[in-house]
């Protein structure tokens, strides 16, 4: 009798283990119920509101899995905060927004000059936002930045957003700036944050192509307020002082012919001792 009672207890225990192990799968979200945000743009709206733009791949596009460039979609929501904008966007989307694959976060210059600490804290506290997401301050609106970004080589725009900042290592024209680094500098008593400076290339005479966005320079902050910017040459000097650039090319005026420039390619002669 006692053995039979112990056997029943053992069977019940096994059943409870299976129930607890598989019950979470019923509450989890399937992949076909999610839509992944690739880029997040934040602009200043009217009446102290924010205009938040979400860019994501079109899951119904036939080119999403092919060799052609995958189609992207974007929606803009006006709300009092980023969290409210996400909640509002979910109310009319067929699928739930997921930010775990967001590669870049863009703030407009208009918003950044007023301070973005509240938005930074909101994003950092969101478990879906990766600290490695690039942060860009756009001289045009964040919505326009997203709309005009059209990679020339990469088929997947998510790959472009992930890779473009890596050119800082061999050009020095932009910093490697992420929201995680920005937040750490924001809470540091001896540091100041900085971000990638973005702009529409339609305002530039030096860049032409299908991608109408250029990322050149550094957006300089005092605490959470945008206070200035560095051009390409100043950015090279800034990154060189921080040992954050491997090699770079600069053009200097020819001292013997003021109409010409000399290109100087700078690389480390020896490895650093410290």
Give the label of every model feature segment:
Residues 2-274:
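Membrane-proximal alpha-helical signals and transmembrane carboxylates
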């Amino acid at each position: 009798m006692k053995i039979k009672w112990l056997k029943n207890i053992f069977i019940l225990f096994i059943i409870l283990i299976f129930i607890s192990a598989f019950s979470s799968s019923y509450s989890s979200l399937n992949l076909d119920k999610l839509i992944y945000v690739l880029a997040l743009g934040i602009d200043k709206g009217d009446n102290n509101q924010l205009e938040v733009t979400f860019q994501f791949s079109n899951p119904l596009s036939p080119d999403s899995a092919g060799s052609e460039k995958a189609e992207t979609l974007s929606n803009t929501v006006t709300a009092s905060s980023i969290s409210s904008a996400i909640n509002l966007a979910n109310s009319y989307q067929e699928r739930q927004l997921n930010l775990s694959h967001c590669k870049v976060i863009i703030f407009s210059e208009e918003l950044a000059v007023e301070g973005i600490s509240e938005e930074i804290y909101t994003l950092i506290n969101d478990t879906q936002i990766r600290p490695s997401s690039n942060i860009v301050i756009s001289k045009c609106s964040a919505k326009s930045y997203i709309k005009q970004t059209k990679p020339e080589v990469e088929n997947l725009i998510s790959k472009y957003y992930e890779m473009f900042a890596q050119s800082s290592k061999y050009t020095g024209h932009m910093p490697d700036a992420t929201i995680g680094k920005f937040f750490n500098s924001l809470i540091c008593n001896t540091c100041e944050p900085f971000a990638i400076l973005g702009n529409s290339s339609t305002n530039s005479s030096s860049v032409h192509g299908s991608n109408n966005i250029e990322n050149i320079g550094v957006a300089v902050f005092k605490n959470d307020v945008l206070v200035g910017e560095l051009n390409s040459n100043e950015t090279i000097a800034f990154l060189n002082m921080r040992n954050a650039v491997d090699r770079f090319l600069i053009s200097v005026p020819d001292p013997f012919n003021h109409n010409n420039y000399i290109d100087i390619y700078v690389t480390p002669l020896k490895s650093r001792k410290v």
